[in-house]
């Protein structure tokens, strides 16, 4: 529940979904709580291309920051954009979250070696 969390100046979303899911329904639930959208293409035949996902968001009055080829790329861009107290949320599919977790793990490995 994003609304119940402590204050953050901005909420950045790393977002990717599969074509057989209710994209509009998911977006409707969170659109007032996200300030910037970083949209990612998901792999496989069920993955929605980032451009198509951005059009669905635009139909709901949401401006997408940029489209990316993968959740990891979207996350890295969100990290560059985010301020010190901002939060980044990854959602839409387990594939989105897995891609972001992989990028976080890669960051940690680079910083510890």
Please provide the spans of the model-predicted regions.
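Short, active-site-adjacent cap segments at secondary-structure transitions
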Residues: 96-98
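Nucleotide phosphate-binding/pyrophosphate-handling subdomain across enzymes
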Residues: 1-36
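Active-site-proximal loop/hinge segments that shape catalytic or ion-binding/gating pockets
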Residues: 93
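C-terminal helical cap/extension that packs against the catalytic core
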Residues: 24-87
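Active-site catalytic pocket residues across diverse enzymes, especially alpha/beta-hydrolases
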Residues: 2, 6, 57, 82, ...
């Amino acid at each position: 529940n994003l609304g119940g969390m402590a204050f953050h100046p901005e909420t950045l979303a790393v977002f990717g979904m599969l074509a057989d899911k209710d994209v509009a329904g998911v977006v409707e639930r969170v659109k007032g709580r996200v300030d910037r959208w970083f949209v990612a293409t998901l792999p496989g035949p069920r993955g929605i291309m980032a451009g198509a996902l951005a059009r669905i968001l635009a139909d709901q009055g949401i401006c997408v920051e940029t489209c990316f080829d993968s959740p990891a790329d979207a996350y890295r861009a969100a990290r560059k954009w985010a301020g010190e107290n901002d939060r980044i949320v990854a959602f839409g599919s387990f594939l989105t979250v897995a891609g972001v977790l992989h990028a976080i793990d890669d960051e940690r490995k680079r910083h510890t070696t």
